[in-house]
């Protein structure tokens, strides 16, 4: 939580512009060469208790390199100082900022991992509920869609998950984000929401994860609601294994799948 990192080095072919919002910060990564006119809105992971870190700036570069995207990364407010709905409100405000900046919904891709993946889904549901322009696609890596920890994989993978397994002390049980709210509220746990009318979505998840069912059950509900859904379970992989970038074959395959999607 209190990790102090060295300054991030922005690759020479990019500009990374800080954007100061009223209650949070954002960073807009832009290729110096011509961009493709579309933007990835990145919502980072960290259990709603960790701020953005350099790994997600590297993620932004990786997203951009797929096809010269601009990438807006949101350093949203986090618990316990700022429980729900702070992060959710910041995600909405970031999306509105893109709309006001001239991006139509069909030129915006939502992408997130872990808590950020759940936030992607919650944001899409909110936009649909408010009849706002919907994004083009949703990309979710190991999304945390069920803050009640009720899915079967929380038990089945309890001893298999190298990150969250064998303990009840991990961030997936701390409850700080939901605070005094019902964790089954769809904007907190989008697994319990209405999936009708949502954009095409990609779920990637590792077979060893306690959060496996967060993706499997959400994808199932989305398909039943008529959504265009791709779910890929990567065998013997752990939570957000895509952080390995090119070091793991499975991570390379996952990033290739994101590019193809």
Show where each model-derived region lies.
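Alpha/beta-hydrolase superfamily serine-hydrolase fold, recognizing
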Residues: 10, 15-261
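N-terminal targeting or regulatory segments adjacent to alpha/beta-hydrolase or S9 domains
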Residues: 1-5
């Amino acid at each position: 939580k209190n990790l102090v990192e060295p300054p991030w080095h922005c690759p020479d072919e990019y500009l990374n512009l800080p954007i100061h919002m009223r209650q949070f910060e954002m960073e807009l990564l832009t290729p110096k060469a011509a961009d493709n006119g579309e933007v990835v809105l990145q919502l980072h992971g960290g259990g709603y208790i960790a701020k953005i870190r350099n790994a997600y700036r590297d993620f932004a570069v990786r997203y951009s390199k797929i096809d010269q995207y601009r990438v807006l990364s949101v350093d949203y407010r986090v618990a316990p100082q700022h429980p729900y709905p702070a992060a959710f409100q910041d995600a909405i405000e970031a999306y509105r900022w893109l709309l006001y900046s001239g991006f139509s919904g069909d030129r915006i891709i939502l992408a997130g991992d872990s808590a950020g993946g759940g936030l992607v889904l919650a944001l899409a549901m909110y936009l649909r509920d408010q009849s706002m322009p919907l994004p083009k696609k949703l990309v979710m890596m190991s999304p945390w869609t069920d803050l009640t920890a009720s899915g079967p994989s929380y038990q089945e993978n309890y001893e298999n998950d190298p990150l969250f397994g064998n303990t009840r002390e991990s961030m997936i049980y701390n409850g700080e984000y939901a605070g005094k709210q019902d964790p089954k509220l769809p904007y907190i746990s989008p697994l319990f929401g209405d999936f009708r009318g949502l954009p095409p979505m990609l779920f990637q998840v590792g077979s060893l994860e306690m959060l496996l069912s967060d993706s499997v059950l959400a994808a199932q509900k989305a398909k039943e609601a008529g959504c265009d859904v791709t779910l890929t379970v990567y065998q013997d992989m752990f939570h957000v294994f895509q952080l390995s970038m090119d070091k793991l074959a499975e991570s390379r395959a996952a990033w290739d799948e994101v590019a193809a999607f």
